[in-house]
From Swiss-Prot:
It comes from Pelargonium hortorum (Common geranium). Part of the 30S ribosomal subunit. PANTHER family: 40S RIBOSOMAL PROTEIN S15A. One of the primary rRNA binding proteins, it binds directly to 16S rRNA central domain where it helps coordinate assembly of the platform of the 30S subunit. Keywords: Chloroplast, Plastid, Ribonucleoprotein, Ribosomal protein, RNA-binding, rRNA-binding. One of its GO terms (molecular function) is structural constituent of ribosome. It holds the Pfam family Ribosomal_S8. It is found in: Plastid, Chloroplast. InterPro entries: Ribosomal_uS8, Ribosomal_uS8_CS, Ribosomal_uS8_sf. GO terms for cellular component: chloroplast; ribonucleoprotein complex; ribosome. This is Small ribosomal subunit protein uS8c.
């Protein structure tokens, strides 16, 4: 059975968020870099940087937390893996779902690269739905 790097990324971010961690370290892959770029651009994470440690590269993400008197609380976003190795989910550009009426983001893998649902609708291309973020 192979590794599903995208599920590992989602699980790492979700677990760090529930544990109220400030940073999370994920392995560096091209898919991870593209998804982190989208998360950063959409404002779901605060910062991302690359860290190299003995021939291995990692992405260190700084999560965006709300502050209150008791310390950091959970962020206000959720991640859900949609298409998985056992059941791939594809959609053309007309049927790409709107997450929370446009408040959330769907991340797609298209022939033109990894992009958000809004970008895919504007470019009129469909693809595999990787994640929902709301």
């Amino acid at each position: 059975m192979g590794k599903d790097t995208l599920s590992e990324i989602v699980t790492s971010i979700r677990n760090a968020d529930m544990a109220k961690k400030e940073t999370v370290r994920i392995t560096f892959t091209n898919i991870a870099q593209n998804i982190v770029t989208i998360l950063l651009r959409e404002g779901f994470i605060k910062n991302a940087r690359e860290h190299r440690e003995s021939k291995k590269s990692f992405l260190v993400l700084t999560l965006r937390h709300r502050r209150n008197r008791k310390g950091p609380s959970r962020t206000l976003f959720n991640l859900k893996r949609v298409s998985r190795p056992g059941l791939r989910i594809y959609s053309n550009y007309q049927k790409i779902p709107r997450i929370l009426g446009g408040m959330g983001v769907a991340i797609l893998s298209t022939s033109k690269g990894i992009m958000t649902d809004r970008e895919a609708r504007l470019k009129r291309i469909g693809g595999e739905i990787l994640l929902y973020i709301w």
